[in-house]
């Protein structure tokens, strides 16, 4: 079978298995050649199969720390209807490369919100893996079933203060279109907080603590985004922003508990605007990111996921100098994005953009290429005309 890209309304319907393998390898090579750091040896990553979660896992294994890792993710292999998600193949090939280096790379495929997955992970930590030095919570999910009540919650991408209308790039047609987003109801806001807020992160932290699965001075980190004022209405002041504030407030509570019990630390890292499977859905975000990419590349400041995570660990978290937080206790990895000169140029370009010139005034080609690479396409060194043996793929297990 020949694997070809298929995009429908900004959602990738296909992935290329060996393109995913090459992209994982490219990220590994970047980390091996970047500034190294001494860090944790035992790491648990909730949401480990793509985006910041995958980059975190690769950086910790290959960027100096040589960490053994457990990855939890919800992915699917080959079925009658699908050829396997990119995350499925990322898990498989990360494990292959990590084990070649003598590292443990355990994958749990399932619903991270569920009691069953939590119990299985804790059992593995206690019986085989050893205590966790670092817990990363990087889950991006559209839905959550609360195991305590059985209630199902769906997250929404809406404002909380009236209708939003703004330009968005349609990657299927390569056109700039106008998107309208309605204001969320109170019920939708609360549901989004249930899915994308800090409740499940807190539950993982509590269970790991209760089951003596954490080393002394263990750290836990989750990821957030604030962005520029241009994105506030749909993001920071929208349903996602409400959920992220809940996440950030949860970090404060976890931090108090971990400091008291294990002399540990909990905080949120506010990251840069980057192409991920999750961010591609956000109205207007694609255009903002494409313009930002152009400006930051011209200033030699651009970072993709793996570059940002390697800098975070090497220059911030595991550097010799004291770790600095903002007034709300957050690590700011969006420091380069929010530089005054960067935002000034982004705003200047934004005011000039039309449906006819947006590809010239932004780095749309670079933005879309990064999106395609998330799914294993447009990667140098991959033979996309190769007829791939489906039966051989089916035998690969994460």
UniProtKB/Swiss-Prot annotation:
NAD(+) binds at residues 47-52, 74-75, 111-112, 139-140, 244, 274-276. It catalyses: a 2,3-saturated acyl-CoA + NAD(+) = a (2E)-enoyl-CoA + NADH + H(+). It is an enzyme of class 1 (oxidoreductase). InterPro entries: Eno_Rdtase_FAD-bd_dom, Enoyl-CoA_Rdtase_cat_dom, FabV-like_NADH_b, NAD(P)-bd_dom_sf, Trans-2-enoyl-CoA_reductase. The active site is at 235 (proton donor). Monomer. Keywords: Fatty acid biosynthesis, Fatty acid metabolism, Lipid biosynthesis, Lipid metabolism, NAD, Oxidoreductase. It comes from the Bacteria. Belongs to the TER reductase family. Substrate binds at residue 225. Pathway: Lipid metabolism; fatty acid biosynthesis. Pfam families: Eno-Rase_FAD_bd (PF07055), Eno-Rase_NADH_b (PF12242), Enoyl_reductase (PF12241). GO terms for biological process: fatty acid biosynthetic process. Involved in the fatty acid synthesis (FAS II). Catalyzes the reduction of a carbon-carbon double bond in an enoyl moiety that is covalently linked to a coenzyme A (CoA). Its EC number is 1.3.1.44. The record marks 75 as: Plays an important role in discriminating NADH against NADPH. This is Trans-2-enoyl-CoA reductase [NADH]. One of its GO terms (molecular function) is NAD binding. Signal peptide: none annotated.
């Amino acid at each position: 079978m020949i694997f070809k890209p298929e995009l429908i309304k900004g959602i990738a319907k296909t992935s290329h298995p060996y393109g995913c393998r090459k992209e994982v390898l490219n990220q590994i090579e970047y980390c091996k050649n970047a500034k190294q750091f001494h860090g944790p040896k035992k790491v648990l990553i909730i949401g480990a199969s793509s985006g910041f979660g995958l980059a975190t896992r690769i950086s910790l294994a290959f960027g100096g720390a040589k960490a053994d890792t457990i990855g939890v993710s919800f992915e699917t292999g080959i079925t009658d209807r699908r050829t396997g998600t990119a995350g499925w193949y990322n898990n498989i090939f990360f494990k292959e490369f990590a084990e070649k280096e003598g590292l443990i790379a355990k994958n749990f495929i399932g619903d991270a919100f569920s009691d069953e997955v939590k119990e299985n992970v804790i059992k593995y930590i206690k019986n085989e893996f050893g205590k966790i030095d670092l817990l990363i919570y990087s889950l991006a999910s559209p839905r959550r079933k609360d195991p305590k009540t059985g209630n199902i919650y769906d997250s929404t991408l809406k404002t909380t203060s009236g209708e939003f209308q703004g330009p968005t790039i349609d990657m299927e047609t390569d056109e700039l279109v106008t998107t309208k987003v309605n204001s969320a109801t109170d019920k939708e806001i609360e549901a989004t907080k249930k899915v994308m807020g800090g409740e499940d992160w807190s539950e993982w932290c509590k269970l790991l603590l209760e089951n003596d699965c954490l080393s002394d001075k263990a750290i836990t980190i989750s990821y957030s985004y604030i962005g520029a004022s241009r994105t506030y209405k749909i993001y920071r002041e929208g349903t996602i922003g409400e959920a992220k504030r809940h996440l950030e407030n949860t970090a404060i509570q976890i931090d108090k508990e971990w400091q008291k019990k294990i002399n540990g630390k909990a905080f949120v890292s506010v990251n840069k605007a980057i192409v991920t499977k999750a961010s591609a859905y956000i109205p207007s975000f694609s255009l903002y990111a494409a313009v930002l990419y152009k400006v930051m590349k011209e200033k030699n400041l651009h970072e993709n996921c793996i570059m940002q995570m390697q800098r975070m660990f090497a220059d911030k978290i595991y550097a010799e100098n004291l770790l600095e937080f903002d007034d709300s206790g957050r690590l700011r990895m969006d420091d380069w994005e929010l530089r005054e000169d960067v935002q000034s140029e982004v705003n200047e370009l934004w005011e000039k953009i039309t449906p006819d010139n947006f590809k010239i005034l932004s780095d749309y080609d670079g933005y879309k290429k990064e999106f395609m690479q998330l799914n294993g396409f447009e990667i140098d060194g991959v033979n996309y005309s190769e007829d791939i043996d489906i039966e051989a793929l089916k035998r690969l297990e994460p």
